[in-house]
Curated annotation (Swiss-Prot):
GO terms for cellular component: chaperonin-containing T-complex. Molecular chaperone; assists the folding of proteins upon ATP hydrolysis. Known to play a role, in vitro, in the folding of actin and tubulin. Its main location: cytoplasm. This is T-complex protein 1 subunit zeta. It comes from the Eukaryota. Signal peptide: none annotated. It is found in: Cytoplasm. Belongs to the TCP-1 chaperonin family. Heterooligomeric complex of about 850 to 900 kDa that forms two stacked rings, 12 to 16 nm in diameter. One of its GO terms (biological process) is protein folding. GO terms for molecular function: ATP binding; ATP hydrolysis activity; ATP-dependent protein folding chaperone; unfolded protein binding.
Amino acid sequence: MSSIQCLNPKAELARHAAALELNISGARGLQDVMRSNLGPKGTLKMLVSGAGDIKLTKDGNVLLHEMAIQHPTASMIAKASTAQDDVTGDGTTSTVLLIGELLKQAESLVLEGLHPRIVTEGFEWANTKTLELLEKFKKEAPVERDLLVEVCRTALRTKLHQKLADHITECVVDAVLAIRRDGEEPDLHMVEKMEMHHDSDMDTTLVRGLVLDHGARHPDMPRHVKDAYILTCNVSLEYEKTEVNSGLFYKTAKEREALLAAEREFITRRVHKIIELKKKVIDNSPDGKNKGFVVINQKGIDPPSLDLLASEGILALRRAKRRNMERLQLAVGGEAVNSVDDLTPEDLGWAGLVYEHSLGEEKYTFIEECRAPKSVTLLIKGPNKHTITQIKDAIHDGLRAVFNTIVDKAVLPGAAAFEIAAYVMLKKDVENLKGRAKLGAEAFAQALLVIPKTLAVNGGYDAQETLVKLIEEKTAAGPDIAVGLDLETGGAVEPQGIWDNVTVKKNSISSATVLACNLLLVDEVMRAGMTNLKQPQPE
């Protein structure tokens, strides 16, 4: 009897070979699920929730988040792979495949009697050599629009069909370039993703400004304003109760009317200060007739205040979302104010066009033609919910791919070129490695081929035949020329315009190696939680 079973007779235990088999079966099971999703030729998965909601996706991160995984090892791999997506924005499926293949290659060695510690030493040596090659293999290049388009297109074509991916690529790259400031990393939170159930997915577009998901709340307000001054504020323009419990008493009806009038006057004075600012910048200017005035307030505006603003031709929006207030300020300029006591023309932003768009019962307000917007909106359109969700997930990955390229200032040849180069290099260098760790290093090199092998199978080609072609071409080409897989012909090609992120590849290989080594060194799996200690209650 094991020590844990002495302490807890109800504990479940798997030791040595059984523990290793448990870990490897979990990793390979998850690998088999994810394998067919890899690359631009990958297939889709249909996820059906308990409520009947349907989601079509080939994004590994979405799959791992949505699937209910019970196996402890598979669950651990899923969490590690989704963490990879959280940090770098991509590489989830590749990480799962690499972990599964590392454990698969190690299984045969361990079953032949090689200690798992020796295997992990070989893995760690090969991982170090691979990351050294990555630093030499990457292409440092000036961050220009053409390069960013190629990187983003490579990422999006693995998530969407080719025509849609090429269309959205332009929008994503222009969005990041619009918010980018010299010498600083772009803040991707300044790219708003607005959904609109309308038209086709090819109508997804970039708005160089902001789109708000609500409209004016007064029928007499203008719905189309050109050359608009915009006041961004967080001021209550409605009667609010006091924060503490308080009461006001009156003796007669006249006193009650006076009380109500005083409350109304307090709000009206605030509205008049906004109207005075409007008159100052528009009515008193020579070309004021051709200009408009817009108020966007984070707090509420009551009907009497809306009446006053509408009578002056002011378009007012109330209860704007907090997350949009900073974006609005960066898009139109000016300063967001918390009080109307000291309003000046310098507080105002400007937009060339503000208009309301109605779609069924929903209303949207577009703020466009901003002078130098530092915040933009990607307007995601689609005929149904699952199409919009699929595009939104892909845009997230595209934004991160562009961001990583700007930060890294380098890219990596794609189409599995790095994995082929690393395999050829490791097979050559492993000859200089002494001892049994050489077997682990060879297994690591073999595991790297899971990426080109899977890409070939998903493209409809024979895996072994394709691998032989690629390895022969790479060996003949030499270390300085990248050789990748051409999914149109199934042959070898030097990748042109197909780039991977350096950060994504580095994190994927590192995290896969660490997790595979940890799982190989597990010699006991114990299920001994408190739930197992509870005794059944007698009836």
